């Protein structure tokens, strides 16, 4: 299979993802039941390493391959947006040695993998704060963004130095500055106004919030975007995770009745959305 995309006026062919070594294939779900945006907390690296008597850093190293496998699984299934929590604003509290490792690691992962992601048609977007981040990390993230900006097989939101509260605080600060400068009428502030001040106003809402490792919390991740997300928690640690676990989570997501605060069954909501939007849904892989 070759996935095709448009780059300017030229048609570009993306490389097809390699099948999973087990031979497993993505489940065939109706396009409207495939989550458009999956947010994932990559948790359990330290525990995985500890169970094996290894340094915590070894769990992160194994997790790099998991990232690529999950991205390929997204493309195979038809998930168009994936957000990965790579380094939070709270992670600065870890030991200087681990912070140093994670800075180097995130920089090097992007450097090592950006060509492969580009070949697969993945658009990379960095989400997070610039202050405190190493210049070399910022540079690699910016290079990756520029290199992949026209890709359209899927979008990876790579969250480095990100926190949901930090994003909302930054949005509030920017809004306050615009109010003080007379560029924004506070009486007209709405949810749509706040959305415009987020790091990526066009980031779609999270449909499926996925966390491996057995922990059941959001950890300050994409708070605004996850307001109506379906939560799936899995016991597998991130280094043991692969695209089959992603697919299981998506099958569970597809079985749920999303009401968005109302009392109308999911099927009827989908029908109304199709009528209003002209069947704008995620297409089958």
From Swiss-Prot:
Any one annotated GO CC term: cytosol
List of catalytic residues: 43, 91 (proton acceptor)
A molecular function (GO) term: magnesium ion binding
Major enzyme class: transferase
Residue sites binding substrate per the record: 44-48, 56, 60, 88-90, 92, 94, 211, 217-219
Alphabetical GO biological process terms: polyprenol biosynthetic process
Gene3D superfamilies hit by this protein: Decaprenyl diphosphate synthase-like (3.40.1180.10)
Co-factor note (free text): Binds 2 magnesium ions per subunit.
Residue numbers binding Mg(2+): 43, 230
Enzyme Commission identifier(s): 2.5.1.-
PROSITE patterns xref list: UPP_SYNTHASE
Subunit relationships: Homodimer.
PANTHER family linked to this entry: DEHYDRODOLICHYL DIPHOSPHATE SYNTHASE 2, DEHYDRODOLICHYL DIPHOSPHATE SYNTHASE FAMILY MEMBER
NCBIfam families linked: PRK14829.1, uppS
Family indicated by similarity: Belongs to the UPP synthase family.
Protein name (record): Isoprenyl transferase 2
Organism lineage: Bacteria, Bacillati, Actinomycetota, Actinomycetes, Kitasatosporales
């Amino acid at each position: 299979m070759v996935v095709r995309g448009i780059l300017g006026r030229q048609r570009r062919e993306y490389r097809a993802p390699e099948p999973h070594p087990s031979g497993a294939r993505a489940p065939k779900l109706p396009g409207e039941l495939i989550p458009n945006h999956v947010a994932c907390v990559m948790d359990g690296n330290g525990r995985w390493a500890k169970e094996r008597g290894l340094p915590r850093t070894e769990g992160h190293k194994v997790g790099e391959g998991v990232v690529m496998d999950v991205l390929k699984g997204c493309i195979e299934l038809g998930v168009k947006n994936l957000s990965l929590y790579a380094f939070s604003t709270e992670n600065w509290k870890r030991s200087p040695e681990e912070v140093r490792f994670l800075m180097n690691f995130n920089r090097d992962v992007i450097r090592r993998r950006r060509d492969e992601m580009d070949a697969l048609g993945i658009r990379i977007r960095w989400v997070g704060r610039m202050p405190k981040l190493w210049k070399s990390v910022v540079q690699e993230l910016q290079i990756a963004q520029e290199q992949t900006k026209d890709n359209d097989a899927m979008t990876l939101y790579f969250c480095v130095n990100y926190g949901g509260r930090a994003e909302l605080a930054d949005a509030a600060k920017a809004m306050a500055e615009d109010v003080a400068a007379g560029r924004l009428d506070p009486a007209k502030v709405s949810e749509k106004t706040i959305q415009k001040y987020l790091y990526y106003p066009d980031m779609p809402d999270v449909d499926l919030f996925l966390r491996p490792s057995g922990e059941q919390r959001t950890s300050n991740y994409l708070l605004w975007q996850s307001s109506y997300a379906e939560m799936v928690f899995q016991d597998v640690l991130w280094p043991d995770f692969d695209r089959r676990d992603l697919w299981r989570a998506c099958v569970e997501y597809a079985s749920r009745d999303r009401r968005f605060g109302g009392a109308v069954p999911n099927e009827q909501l989908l029908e109304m959305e199709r009528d209003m939007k002209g069947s704008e849904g995620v297409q089958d892989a």
